[in-house]
Amino acid sequence: MIPWNAYVRLLRLNKPIGILLLWYPTAWALWMANQGFPSIDLLMIFLLGTVFMRSAGCVINDIADRHIDRHVARTQFRPLTAGEVSLSEAFILLFILLCASLLLLLKLPINCFYFAVISVLITFLYPFCKRFLNAPQLILGLAFSMGIPMAFIASGKNLNSDFIVLFLINFSWIIAYDTMYAMTDKADDLKIGVKSTAIYFASYDRLIIALLLIFLHSLWLVWAINKNAEWFFYLLWCTAAGILTYQLKLIYARIPKNCFKAFLVSGYYGLVMWFAVGLALI
C-alpha cells in the first residue's frame, strides 16, 4: 500500500505555512512587476513552482537531517525519521518534484533559469549550513527570495528599484520569522549542536527581530510613498504593523509554543501586505 499520508507529511502539504511564506513575496513581485495585473499564465507557473520547490526543499531538508530530527521533540516523528518513508522513496519524490519544476521553468525566459539554478543549489546547501554557519537563516533568506527576481524577469521587467526594496523587505522578513521558528527548538538545538540565529543572537534575539521588523515595514512606506499609494494602502499597512506587534508580544517570554505561534502568524502579515500591494497598484 502506498503511504500517501506519509508522503503528504514529508512534503508538508498538511502544513501550508511554508508554501504561503514562499508564495507571498513572489506574489508581491508579480503584482509590482505587472502594475497589479499579472497574467493567469504567470500566476499558475509561479504558484505551482512555489508548491513544487517548497516541497522539494522539505524533502532535501529531511534527507539531510534524518539522523538529527530524532533528537528534536518537534521533528522526531517526521516520516523519514520515523521510517514511514524510505530513503529511496524520498529521493524518487525529490526527483519528480525537480522534474516538474523544470517543466515549468521551460515556459519562462532563459534569464530565469540562472536564478532557478542558484535557488536549487542554495536549497540543497541550506540543511548543511545549520551544522557550520552561525546564521543559516541568511542562506534561507536567499533561497526564499529567488522567486522575486524570477517574477520580475518573467514579467519582462528589469531588476529595478522596486526589486531592490522588495528583496530587502523579504530578506529581512525571513530572518525575523525564521528566528522566531528557531526559538521553538533552541533548547534541543543547543544539545545537539545545530546552529541558528536564535542561538547566535543570544539575549539580543528579541531586539534584533524587532529591529528587522521595523526596518522592513518602514521600507513598505518608502515604496508606497514613491508609488503615491492611496489611503487604503496605509490602512492595511497599519493593520500589518499590528500583526508585527502581536508577534513581538508572543515571543517576549521566549516560550517555545508561543514562538512557534508567532512564526505561524507571519502568514497573516504576508497576506495583508499582498492585499496592500494589490490595492496600491490599482
From Swiss-Prot:
<keyword id="KW-0831">Ubiquinone biosynthesis</keyword>
<comment type="pathway">
    <text>Cofactor biosynthesis; ubiquinone biosynthesis.</text>
</comment>
<dbReference type="InterPro" id="IPR044878">
    <property type="entry name" value="UbiA_sf"/>
</dbReference>
<feature type="transmembrane region" description="Helical">
    <location>
        <begin position="163"/>
        <end position="183"/>
    </location>
</feature>
<keyword id="KW-0812">Transmembrane</keyword>
<feature type="transmembrane region" description="Helical">
    <location>
        <begin position="135"/>
        <end position="155"/>
    </location>
</feature>
<keyword id="KW-0472">Membrane</keyword>
<dbReference type="InterPro" id="IPR006370">
    <property type="entry name" value="HB_polyprenyltransferase-like"/>
</dbReference>
<keyword id="KW-0997">Cell inner membrane</keyword>
<comment type="similarity">
    <text>Belongs to the UbiA prenyltransferase family.</text>
</comment>
<feature type="transmembrane region" description="Helical">
    <location>
        <begin position="262"/>
        <end position="282"/>
    </location>
</feature>
<feature type="transmembrane region" description="Helical">
    <location>
        <begin position="231"/>
        <end position="251"/>
    </location>
</feature>
<feature type="transmembrane region" description="Helical">
    <location>
        <begin position="40"/>
        <end position="60"/>
    </location>
</feature>
<dbReference type="GO" id="GO:0005886">
    <property type="term" value="C:plasma membrane"/>
</dbReference>
<keyword id="KW-0808">Transferase</keyword>
<feature type="transmembrane region" description="Helical">
    <location>
        <begin position="207"/>
        <end position="227"/>
    </location>
</feature>
<dbReference type="GO" id="GO:0008412">
    <property type="term" value="F:4-hydroxybenzoate polyprenyltransferase activity"/>
</dbReference>
<keyword id="KW-0460">Magnesium</keyword>
<feature type="transmembrane region" description="Helical">
    <location>
        <begin position="113"/>
        <end position="133"/>
    </location>
</feature>
<dbReference type="InterPro" id="IPR030470">
    <property type="entry name" value="UbiA_prenylTrfase_CS"/>
</dbReference>
<keyword id="KW-1003">Cell membrane</keyword>
<dbReference type="GO" id="GO:0006744">
    <property type="term" value="P:ubiquinone biosynthetic process"/>
</dbReference>
<comment type="function">
    <text>Catalyzes the prenylation of para-hydroxybenzoate (PHB) with an all-trans polyprenyl group. Mediates the second step in the final reaction sequence of ubiquinone-8 (UQ-8) biosynthesis, which is the condensation of the polyisoprenoid side chain with PHB, generating the first membrane-bound Q intermediate 3-octaprenyl-4-hydroxybenzoate.</text>
</comment>
<feature type="transmembrane region" description="Helical">
    <location>
        <begin position="90"/>
        <end position="110"/>
    </location>
</feature>
<dbReference type="Pfam" id="PF01040">
    <property type="entry name" value="UbiA"/>
</dbReference>
<protein>
    <recommendedName>
        <fullName>4-hydroxybenzoate octaprenyltransferase</fullName>
        <ecNumber>2.5.1.39</ecNumber>
    </recommendedName>
</protein>
<keyword id="KW-1133">Transmembrane helix</keyword>
<dbReference type="InterPro" id="IPR039653">
    <property type="entry name" value="Prenyltransferase"/>
</dbReference>
<dbReference type="InterPro" id="IPR000537">
    <property type="entry name" value="UbiA_prenyltransferase"/>
</dbReference>
<feature type="transmembrane region" description="Helical">
    <location>
        <begin position="17"/>
        <end position="37"/>
    </location>
</feature>
